[in-house]
Curated annotation (Swiss-Prot):
Superkingdom field: Eukaryota
GO MF terms held by the record: beta-D-fucosidase activity; beta-galactosidase activity; beta-glucosidase activity
Protein name: Beta-glucosidase 38
Disulfides per UniProt: C211-C214
Name of the gene this protein is made from: BGLU38
Enzyme Commission code: 3.2.1.21
Signal peptide: 1-21
Catalytic-site annotation from UniProt: E192, E400
Organism whose genome encodes this protein: Oryza sativa subsp. japonica
Length: 492
């Protein structure tokens, strides 16, 4: 008997005797009929084969060439090799009982040069993935853009800082609609545009690493707003293309994924309530207000003034109503209080808030492995109800929700993720409460399927419900997958 098989037997035996407290009163039947349970990933984090099979470089490939960008100096050149092992991953979804898989298409795998010559290997890969999903009754939810701009477009015209990006993104989107739209009925244009605008152009934490004082250059007072403006226009123009050319025939839907931390006032002071309002407007409202009402929030207009770009009348009309559903990526909640910091002008300082993780010495919630993530289940209820009440009661999808563990945990201990089971159970209870109170939530995607490459944290942080042995790429489902199976399939 070989060692991998012996290890697998040991894991199964220990797991069965581990007593992981998986009981829950949640079942599929406690959610509305047709509610979609799924899991999620992104191309850059799971595919690997970064410069193989015709794929061109993206801005993350270039960014990660610098030593020390990730704590473990890891890259996503190989990551968890879903490019070759997508069948294993879909099979695991089927075993759990998931209805859907949210994944992204790598722009530079389809168009290595941003546009122009098509990479047939890349096109064929996504056909294989989608076809295998459909053959196994897993619904594709496809994201067109998840952080991974083709490097050539940044080199040519600074990417999201230039209006030309709108035209190029629409051409890429149009190709995807035309090529996959007869099989894909659920689209998202862009994942977390705020994160790209802030980290790519505000503090330099993400590629292209631009900010005031950053080595590549930049202006933290203006560039985040310019990038966000072009991201919004790209989203809206892609939605218009889909609706004008494809939606009536393909009968699909299209939306956007927006990150949303819930911001709770630190005290009952009026100024802290105003600070929490500003924080929500400068994050979710930055994108969802234009999509709902056709213009930026007045809070931002008053604070940012001439640094905030304006929409033309035509652009405003194009953006307003440019989503069939809104996906919210929600993980955590913070306290905020009023605080003016004018030592420098930047997107983050424009909020005039201070973020806190405790009140009167009491933490807002238990901290996960990541120092930004606290377990605050009631935050998802407030976040969802805020979207319902402020943005005309849209159809809502929870696009991401999850918690991480240290990346150095190994087998079999890494499989015993009771803390993750507790997180999912508590957050789903609060989500169910929001649905009961009238929120039109139609789906929930757990982040993430796999222990994959976690951006600036490399492999030191793991959000997956499936452990991946990176020496063999063997997948080992964690206890949380069994919890989901019992909940979704209503098993005793």
């Amino acid at each position: 008997m070989n060692m991998p098989l012996l290890l697998l037997i040991a894991i199964v035996v220990v797991s069965l005797s581990h007593g992981n407290g998986e009981q829950t009163d949640l079942t599929r039947e406690t959610f509305p009929a047709g509610f979609v349970f799924g899991t999620a990933s992104s191309a850059y984090q799971v595919e690997g084969n970064a410069l193989q099979y015709g794929r061109g470089p993206c801005i993350w490939d270039t960014f990660l060439m610098q030593p020390g960008v990730t704590p473990d100096n890891s890259t996503a050149n190989v990551t968890v090799d879903e490019y070759h092992r997508y069948m294993d991953d879909v099979d695991n979804m089927v075993r759990v009982g998931f209805d859907a898989y949210r994944f992204s298409i790598s722009w530079s795998r389809i168009f290595p040069s941003g546009l122009g010559k098509i990479n047939k290997d890349g096109v064929d890969y996504y056909h294989r993935l989608i076809d295998y999903m459909l053959a196994n009754n897993i619904i594709p939810y496809v994201v067109l853009y998840h952080y991974d701009l083709p490097q050539v477009l940044h080199d040519q015209y600074k990417g999201w800082l230039h209006p030309r990006i709108v035209r190029d993104f629409v051409r890429f989107a149009d190709f995807c609609f035309k090529t996959y739209g007869h099989k894909v009925k659920n689209w998202f244009t862009i994942n977390e545009p705020r994160m790209m605008a802030n980290h790519g152009y505000g503090d330099g934490f993400f590629p292209p690493g631009r900010c005031t004082g950053c080595q590549p250059g930049g202006n933290s007072a203006t560039e985040p707003y310019i990038a966000a403006h072009n991201l919004l226009l790209s989203h809206a123009a892609a939605v218009r293309t889909y609706r004008d050319k494809y939606q009536a025939i393909q009968k699909g839907k299209i939306g956007i994924l927006l990150d949303f931390v819930w911001y709770e006032p630190l005290t009952d002071k009026e100024e802290d309530h105003a600070a929490a309002h500003r924080a929500r407007e400068f994050t979710l409202g930055w994108y969802l207000h234009p999509i709902t009402y056709g213009h930026y929030p007045e809070t931002m207009q008053n604070a940012v003034k001439e640094r905030l770009p304006n929409f033309t009348r035509e652009q405003s009309e194009m953006i307003k109503g440019s989503a069939d559903y809104i996906a919210i990526n929600h993980y955590t909640t913070y306290y905020v209080s009023h605080h003016v910091n004018k030592t420098s002008i930047s997107y983050l300082n424009d909020w005039d808030v201070k973020i806190s993780y405790e009140r009167n010495g009491v933490p807002i919630g238990k901290q996960a492995y990541s120092n930004w993530l606290y377990v605050v289940p009631w935050g998802i209820y407030k976040a969802v109800m805020h979207v319902k009440e402020k943005y005309k009661d849209p159809i809502i999808i929870i696009g991401e929700n999850g918690i991480d563990q240290p990346g150095n945990e190994t087998l079999p201990g890494a499989l015993y993720d009771f803390f993750r089971i507790q997180y999912f159970d508590q957050y789903l209870h609060e989500l169910k409460r929001a649905i009961k109170d009238g929120a039109r939530v139609t789906g929930y995607f757990a982040w993430s399927l796999l222990d994959n490459f976690e951006w600036r944290l490399g492999f030191t942080s793991k959000f997956g419900i499936v452990y991946v042995d990176r020496s063999t790429f063997t997948r080992y489902p964690k206890d949380s997958t069994r919890w989901f199976r019992k909940m979704i399939k209503s098993e005793v």
